UniProtKB/Swiss-Prot annotation:
Species of origin: Chlamydomonas reinhardtii
GO CC terms: chloroplast thylakoid membrane; photosystem II
Pfam family name, one: PSII
GO molecular function terms noted in the UniProt entry: chlorophyll binding; electron transporter, transferring electrons within the cyclic electron transport pathway of photosynthesis activity
Record key words, sorted: Chlorophyll, Chloroplast, Chromophore, Membrane, Photosynthesis, Photosystem II, Plastid, Thylakoid, Transmembrane, Transmembrane helix
Subcellular location: Plastid, Chloroplast thylakoid membrane
HAMAP family in the record: PSII_PsbB_CP47
Taxonomic lineage: Eukaryota, Viridiplantae, Chlorophyta, core chlorophytes, Chlorophyceae
Presence of keyword Manganese: no
Protein name: Photosystem II CP47 reaction center protein
Gene name, Swiss-Prot/TrEMBL: psbB
Spans through the membrane: 21-36, 101-115, 140-156, 203-218, 237-252, 457-472
Length: 508
């Protein structure tokens, strides 16, 4: 039988044994990829500086997902927090990767077995002797088992009853660690940034899945519903499965891009909206003002700002700054962050403090403008000499650093002031090592951006796949030329002239 590549799946339509086989092989491929990718990432990951060179700056994709579920130690002797691993045990990064590869091998062998021994008695209808699958019952079994798994994850793993818990952090991504989480059963459980909602929703959804599974195992669908939804067709199962997958892909794309308790910024990097809204900038200013109110000097106040918080307030960590087709990790763009130079404070010759207007997300270049506290432009870096009345030279702008490596230093040289004004457009100023990775200076996206882009694309593709296969299975008889009124046309006595719908209809 010569089939084109896009029709080869038809060979498993009436072959339950080999249908199981191809699903086992698919799961083997997914599991094998996950384990292999994890081992690759472990081999290239540098755990030495979790503050300025975290996993998301290095382009790690699998490691953040392992970490948020409670894996923090490596057999290599390191931990995700930069400390020395004491007792990693079997559930280390390498242990989980190995488990996935072993599972992949077992699934591969199971797939080969089911492909070879496809004609099992189990798959034959005892009444007809033909191959058949009780799809409503199989649906109930899947619901029941997935409900048990969902409940177990929420009730045991997340809560720490039997498991490590999950990654929990503060809104500013400073205190993250793996810890047990108590379920939130009130309205706060619907807060997407509340980790307690993860536990309670998995418990509730798991109970619902178990009950729904038992219902479908015990109750048979009516004949009208069975045929109306084509419950006997494997293509119906394909269509509804694709619907579940594309919906899940859309949801996780949203929680990843907009941020949630399940996508902490310490593991996946900040969101673009945290830059757009000045989220970290406001927190830094709040902390500085609080220190000043306690009597600290400007230098001391800025020195108290965690380097981690300052690094978040840098546009290069914005996932929307990297183009979709710029391959590579963030470190391949602006380089490996070495240290915070400190907060740059600009002043004109009249003593007014000036603030550099920050670059919006979707700009590659932006005019360098220095505004006073009232928002009035007092200085800039002009494009032409004819427009230079606000130039750094004429206004006499100086820059002083507080905190960081340049703490207490003041620069008045116009060329140096311009250099730091351009850097201040991008947020807090950091020194980068661009030679180690031969970084090209062009921003890249973080795993948050790649995950979102990939899942939105696949969700759209699967959405059309759902429509396609759903239409094929529901309107199969119509596509085959069998219309709804075909029985009326061929039934004797319905029309005065058999098969002629234009003739008068007999009254009954």
């Amino acid at each position: 039988m010569g089939l084109p590549w896009y029709r080869v799946h038809t060979v498993v339509i009436n072959d339950p044994g080999r249908l199981i086989s191809v699903h086992l092989m698919h799961t083997a491929l997914v599991s094998g990829w996950a384990g292999s990718m994890a081992l690759f990432e472990i081999s290239v990951f540098d755990p030495s500086d979790p503050v300025l060179n975290p996993m998301w700056r290095q382009g790690m994709f699998v490691l953040p997902f392992m970490t948020r579920l409670g894996i923090t130690q490596s057999w290599g002797g390191w931990t995700i927090s930069g400390e020395t691993a004491t007792n990693p045990g079997i559930w280390s990064y390498e242990g989980v990767a190995a488990a996935h590869i072993i599972l992949s091998g077992a699934l591969f062998l199971a797939s080969v077995w089911h492909w070879t021994y496809w004609d099992l008695e189990l798959f034959r209808d005892p009444r007809t002797g033909k191959t058949a699958l009780d799809l409503p019952k199989i649906f109930g079994i899947h619901l029941f088992l997935s409900g048990l798994l969902c409940f177990g994850f929420g009730a045991f793993h997340v809560t720490g009853v039997f498991g490590p818990g999950i990654w929990v952090s503060d809104p500013y991504g400073l205190t993250g660690r793996v810890q047990p989480v108590a379920p939130s059963w009130g309205a706060d459980g619907f807060d997407p940034y509340n980790p307690g909602g993860i536990a309670s929703h998995h418990i509730a959804a798991g109970i619902l899945g178990v009950l729904a599974g038992l219902f479908h195992l015990c109750v048979r669908p009516s004949i009208r519903l069975y045929f109306g939804l084509s419950m006997g067709s494997i293509e119906t199962v394909l269509s509804s499965s694709i619907a579940a997958v594309f919906w899940a892909a859309f949801v996780v794309a949203g929680t990843m891009w907009y941020g949630s308790a399940a996508t902490p910024i310490e593991l996946f990097g900040p969101t673009r909206y945290q830059w757009d809204q000045g989220f970290f900038q406001q927190e830094i200013q709040k902390r500085v003002q609080a220190s000043l109110a306690e009597g600290a000097s400007l230098s001391d106040a800025w020195s108290r700002i965690p380097e981690k918080l300052a690094f978040y307030d840098y546009i290069g960590n914005n996932p929307a700054k990297g183009g979709l087709f710029r391959t590579g990790a963030m470190n391949s763009g602006d380089g490996i962050a070495v240290g915070w130079l400190g907060h740059a404070s600009f002043k004109d010759q009249e003593g007014r403090e000036l603030f550099v207007r920050r670059m919006p997300t979707f700009f590659e270049t932006f005019p360098v403008l220095l505004l006073d506290k009232d928002g009035i432009v007092r200085a800039d870096v002009p494009f032409r000499k004819a427009e230079s009345k606000y130039s750094i030279e004429q206004v006499g702008v100086s820059v002083t650093f507080y905190g960081g490596e340049l703490d207490g230093l003041t620069f008045t040289d116009p060329a140096t002031v311009k250099k730091y004004a351009r850097k201040a457009q991008l947020g807090e100023i950091f020194e980068f090592d661009r030679s180690t990775l031969q970084s090209d200076g062009v921003f890249r996206s973080s795993p948050r951006g790649w995950f979102t882009f990939g899942h939105v694309c696949f969700a759209l593709l699967f959405f059309f796949g759902h429509i396609w296969h759903g239409a094929r299975t529901i309107f199969r008889d119509v596509f085959a030329g069998i219309d709804d009124d075909i029985n009326d046309q061929v039934e004797f006595g319905k029309y005065k002239k058999l098969g002629d719908t234009s003739s008068l209809r007999e009254a009954f």
